[in-house]
């Protein structure tokens, strides 16, 4: 990673990003031929970080997800929601074919980014957790039609952060500090087909069986979380989860 914490006091602007990453790829050519709505969403402004999760700038979703920029060290903030029903079944989604990154792959309930807006940006861990919870409410409604009233802010539980990097197709990829959020709720779905192709609820046993099915493809971050921590957390969902909450250290994957 080429950034250092010495830059964290700079104003969070596009101009500061160009100073930090003078060779950053800002071209629009990679978006040619993709779905119009997904192209529009690539203009959303993500929070760019140093390796300690301190905001150092902003950049569009497109810029953050180009492998040419990821290979230069560009890192951004993200979140992953794991929503369980009252049977402790986990809601999965299959990403839509229209998605530019990781299309058609199965993943956890919702995976996205807090935006550089006052309600979702934070420089302290406490403020950052609050920001990703608000972002999670926003995206659960956008992707799955889940109303905020069914997923109250105070019902989200923050577990930890993971820092990982994963290519998608050679052109696109992920390099994120990902906030892991659990919530238990029975919800009504109204799927946005431009975002989500399918959904299903799984048990730990059925999910492990699906991992052995070569016809099913899962996102790399979901597999990382499953292979390292998820099943232990899941086992303690109703009793004992407290000891896993609010981890301060970033897990490097």
From Swiss-Prot:
Short sequence motif Nudix box: positions: 112-145
Enzyme superclass (EC): isomerase
Cofactor or coenzyme needed: Mg(2+)
Residues that, per the record, bind substrate: 61, 94, 99, 112
Protein name: Isopentenyl-diphosphate delta-isomerase IDI1
Upper taxonomic lineage: Eukaryota, Fungi, Dikarya, Ascomycota, Pezizomycotina
Family in the record: Belongs to the IPP isomerase type 1 family.
Keywords annotated in UniProt: Isomerase, Isoprene biosynthesis, Lipid biosynthesis, Lipid metabolism, Magnesium, Metal-binding, Steroid biosynthesis, Steroid metabolism, Sterol biosynthesis, Sterol metabolism
GO cellular component: a single term: cytoplasm
Free-text remark on how the cofactor is bound: Binds 1 Mg(2+) ion per subunit.
Record flagged with keyword Lipid biosynthesis: yes
GO biological process entries: dimethylallyl diphosphate biosynthetic process; isopentenyl diphosphate biosynthetic process; sterol biosynthetic process
